[in-house]
């Protein structure tokens, strides 16, 4: 991972901790908290493991780039991530450990699919999303992410779940949406297989053009450097 400095330079995490320009933008105590753990190195695995969120992303090519390209984050984005994490912790702090941050894993021959359920209390699976603007309806990939977690539960666990809810949290309000219970495991498997094939061939999957393109951090790679792969 590289940190994009306010000066425009790209820094290693350790250097960013003492960078004068980074310190000028974010006070030292906050900066060090933002950078904590950001220099972790990925450990090689025998077979790839994909998060549910990466498989239900609007564009599988973006998920491919997130694996193959070095991650670059600016301080504003780091603050957004950290704020979201803090809100998640606040919401779930009174839940028993067995009802929050529940790790799930589905093994396939060539890959695994993994995820963390934000909360699963009584008969409901909850997925929390922090946002500046609360939508009028749940975004499709957020609904799919929650449904994906439900799909990966053991049959006896699924039988106990009557509701799946996506909860949007802004600094001003909270809004809850219920999404249908449905099994999307075949979709997750197909997307993971496609991503595995693309990674093995070192060729990006087909571009999935949509509204997200103009906000994508990999726009230049996708539409310029790799346009020959369309």
Specify the residue positions occupied by each region the protein language model found:
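Acidic active-site catalytic centers that drive phospho-/nucleotidyl reactions
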Residues: 118, 127, 145
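A broad detector of the eukaryotic-type serine/threonine protein kinase catalytic domain
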Residues: 130-133, 200
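A residue-level signal for conserved active-site and pocket-lining positions in enzyme catalytic cores
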Residues: 59, 149, 216
């Amino acid at each position: 991972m590289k940190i994009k400095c306010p000066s425009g330079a790209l820094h290693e995490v350790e250097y960013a901790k003492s960078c004068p320009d980074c310190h000028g933008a974010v006070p030292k105590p906050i900066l060090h908290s933002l950078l904590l753990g950001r220099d972790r190195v990925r450990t090689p695995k025998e077979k790839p493991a994909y998060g549910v969120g990466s498989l239900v992303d609007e564009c599988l090519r973006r998920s491919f780039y997130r694996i193959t390209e070095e991650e670059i984050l600016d301080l504003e984005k780091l603050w957004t991530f950290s704020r979201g994490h803090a809100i998640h912790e606040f919401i779930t702090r009174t839940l028993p450990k067995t009802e929050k941050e529940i790790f799930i894993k589905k093994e396939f021959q060539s890959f695994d699919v993994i995820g963390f359920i934000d909360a699963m209390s009584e008969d409901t699976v909850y997925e929390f999303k922090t946002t500046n603007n609360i939508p009028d309806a749940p975004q499709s990939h957020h609904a799919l992410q929650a449904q994906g977690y439900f799909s990966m539960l053991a049959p006896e666990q699924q039988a106990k779940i009557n509701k799946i809810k996506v909860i949007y949290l802004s600094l001003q309000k909270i809004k809850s949406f219920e999404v249908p219970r449905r099994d999307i495991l075949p979709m997750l498997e197909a997307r993971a297989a496609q991503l595995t094939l693309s990674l093995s061939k070192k060729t990006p999957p087909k571009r999935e053009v949509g509204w997200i393109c103009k906000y994508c951090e990999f726009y230049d790679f996708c539409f310029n450097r790799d346009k020959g792969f369309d």
